[in-house]
Swiss-Prot record:
One of its GO terms (molecular function) is quinone binding. Keywords: Cell inner membrane, Cell membrane, Membrane, NAD, Quinone, Translocase, Transport, Ubiquinone. NDH-1 shuttles electrons from NADH, via FMN and iron-sulfur (Fe-S) centers, to quinones in the respiratory chain. The immediate electron acceptor for the enzyme in this species is believed to be ubiquinone. Couples the redox reaction to proton translocation (for every two electrons transferred, four hydrogen ions are translocated across the cytoplasmic membrane), and thus conserves the redox energy in a proton gradient. One of its GO terms (cellular component) is plasma membrane. It comes from Hyphomonas neptunium (strain ATCC 15444). InterPro entries: NADH_Q_OxRdtase_suD (IPR001135), NADH_UbQ_OxRdtase_49kDa_CS (IPR014029), NDH1_su_D/H (IPR022885), NiFe-Hase_large (IPR029014). It is found in: Cell inner membrane. Belongs to the complex I 49 kDa subunit family. It is a peripheral membrane protein. This is NADH-quinone oxidoreductase subunit D. Its EC number is 7.1.1.-. NDH-1 is composed of 14 different subunits. Subunits NuoB, C, D, E, F, and G constitute the peripheral sector of the complex.
């Protein structure tokens, strides 16, 4: 019997597990020879629950998938419904959606960078990341009433318009945020210990990306400039000017650098959205005069038909024509997609959710084999997985 070979249980309560992940690691001394990921500990049957809810009632379930950036998931659900209905959202609503999707991207990347750096021993950056993330949570709350589970997007637009004061505060935050990123990068990016722990660790080449079905930063970190916002533009992304940051080596370090650069690009997109809203002026944020949107409060006080419409919208919901479609968004963690099958009723026949973290976690065995035990948490951190969406 070789006493150098043994099996180790990692998680599901481990602080570096980023949720309820259990991994069974086979080790040869300090070297990892096999990783067996056990998932399902956060399974809530979301896809089945959606079949029993109206399209509007299904919306809050998407906030609870990737709860690090909730509105990005709502976006995919709305796009799928709108695709089947054949409707186009008002321009101002489209701009607000893009702006809050980018706020969600920064929220997710701040959390990932802060915890990922902490996993390899740096304790200061996470406090700076959370300080900035807290301000973004306040912007979520001021738009929707909730810091986390917003349920702000709607099929046909967004729930309500943003007050001008909130837009001004977002612009002010965007002006100071790049300085905070410089502060984090000054401590981390060229740090000798951080580079030793991440350079040439968890390398993926372009062939592996295609084989495993990776998306998001996992693709761009290896040099492929694949971003749905650029390659398959939705909403008003085709009008916006932004770069797609890419890495060269496909290792942990390149993925960290890509996320830092993406936050800078997201700030540029948010500022462009604010300029577009200022140029276009006030406008509707929800499809007016359709079965998708509730009537105005003033109309409900004077019209019995408006009151009935309001009641039926929130009890029975609206009917979606029979058909099927796939709608995807470039979420912070990769391509988040919804394959929606409608049977002509007020509830979906089937909704299949494509979680970007699922194929990434499958590759843990490939990524960690031959590395040391201490590198497992570093690799896991740069995958940026969240179990709300993986277990569903």
């Amino acid at each position: 019997m070789d006493d150098r070979k043994f099996t180790l249980n990692f998680g599901p309560q481990h602080p570096a597990a980023h949720g309820v992940l259990r991994m069974i690691l086979d080790l040869d001394g300090e070297i990892v020879t096999r990783v067996d990921s056990h998932i399902g500990l956060l399974h809530r049957g979301t896809e089945k629950l959606l079949e029993y809810k109206t399209y509007l009632q299904g919306m809050p379930y998407f906030d609870r998938l990737d709860y690090c950036a909730p509105m990005n998931q709502e976006h995919a659900w709305c796009l799928a419904i709108e695709k089947l209905l054949g409707v186009e959202v008002p321009r101002r609503a489209s701009i607000i959606r893009v702006m809050y999707s980018e706020i969600g991207r920064i929220m997710s990347h701040l959390l990932n960078v802060g915890t990922g750096v902490m996993d390899v021993g740096a304790l200061t950056p996470i406090t700076w990341c959370f300080e900035e993330r807290e301000k973004l949570c306040v912007f979520y709350e001021r738009a929707s009433g909730s810091r986390m589970h917003a349920a702000y997007f709607r099929p046909g637009g967004v729930h309500q318009d943003l007050p001008q004061r909130l837009i001004d505060d977002i612009a002010t935050w965007c002006d100071q945020f790049p300085g905070k990123l410089d502060q984090i990068e000054g401590l981390v990016t060229e740090n000798r210990i951080f580079k030793q722990r991440n350079v040439d660790i968890g390398v993926v080449d372009q062939r592996t990306i295609l084989d495993w079905g990776f998306s998001g930063v996992m693709v761009r970190g290896s040099g492929l400039a694949w971003d749905l916002r650029r390659s398959q533009p939705y909403e008003c992304y085709s009008e916006l000017d932004f770069k797609v940051p890419v890495g060269r080596h496909g290792d942990n370090y390149d993925r960290y650098v890509c996320r830092m650069d993406e936050m800078r690009e997201s700030v540029k997109i948010i500022l462009q959205c604010i300029d577009l809203m200022a140029k276009d002026g006030p406008g509707p944020v929800l499809l007016a005069g359709s079965k998708l949107s509730p009537p105005r409060r003033a109309d409900m006080k004077n019209s019995m038909e408006a009151l009935i419409h309001h009641f039926k919208l929130y009890t029975e919901g609206f009917h979606v024509p029979e058909g099927e479609c796939y709608a995807a968004v470039e979420a912070p963690k990769g391509e988040f997609g919804v394959y929606l099958v409608a049977d002509g009723t007020n509830r979906p026949y089937r909704a299949k959710i494509r979680a970007p973290g699922y194929p990434h976690l499958q590759a843990m065995d490939y990524l960690c084999k031959g590395h040391q035990l201490a590198d497992v948490s570093a690799v896991l951190g740069t995958l940026d997985i969240v179990f709300g969406e993986i277990d569903r």
